[in-house]
Design a protein with these regions (language model features):
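N-terminal interaction modules that seed assembly of large macromolecular complexes
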Residues: 25-58
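Charged alpha-helical initiation segments
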Residues: 1-35
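A generic "alpha-helical surface" signal
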Residues: 7, 34, 38-41, 129-136
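Secondary-structure edge/capping motif, primarily at the C-terminal ends of alpha-helices
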Residues: 16-27, 50, 54, 145-149
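Short hairpin/turn module used for nucleic-acid contact or packing/dimerization
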Residues: 2, 138, 147-150
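Short low-complexity stretches enriched in small and charged residues
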Residues: 1-5, 52, 92-99
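Long, charged low-complexity segments
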Residues: 58-142
Length: 150
């Protein structure tokens, strides 16, 4: 039986959604929170590749860089007049810094589990509600790419 496949960014978003609404509901650990952030990063990476591929097809760029960070920086440079894109990519860069940073756990296995990270000189407290916001913004980015680069 033929089953239509979805683009990779939507698959990663589904996995992130499961982590957010199922796994975190029952486990409430910072490891699940970090995995969710990694899934959001992967969804961004696939969407950035999609946007750059469309730009390459239209002749705006010659080559697509190999590293995810270089691809995102190139997309940011090519769309620097687009405030929405700048906001979305700023969140992506923050995700990458959070993923690589040292972190502390607070109230793990409890309702208010918190992942605290030092980012650019300030502490960021990531809670489940914060992750919901990040998930929704990532979803918005993927839809933005789909609407503007398809």
């Amino acid at each position: 039986m033929y089953q239509e496949t979805q683009p990779e960014e939507f698959e990663e978003l589904k996995r992130a959604e499961h982590l957010l609404f199922v796994s975190l509901k029952y486990t409430k650990t910072t490891d699940v929170m970090k995995n969710l952030i990694r899934r959001l990063i992967n969804a961004y990476d696939y969407a950035v590749i999609k946007a750059l591929t469309r730009m390459k097809e239209k002749g705006r760029i010659k080559d697509i860089p190999l590293s995810p960070l270089s691809r995102a920086e190139l997309l940011r440079d090519l769309t620097k007049k687009d405030a929405d894109m700048i906001d979305f990519l700023s969140l992506y860069f923050m995700f990458r810094r959070v993923d690589r940073a040292e972190y502390t756990k607070k109230e793990e296995f409890r309702k208010n589990v918190t992942l605290t990270v030092m980012d650019e000189g300030e502490f960021i407290e990531i809670k489940i509600d914060t992750l919901r916001e990040y998930f929704n913004k990532t979803k918005g980015f993927i839809n933005y790419i789909k609407e503007n680069f398809s």
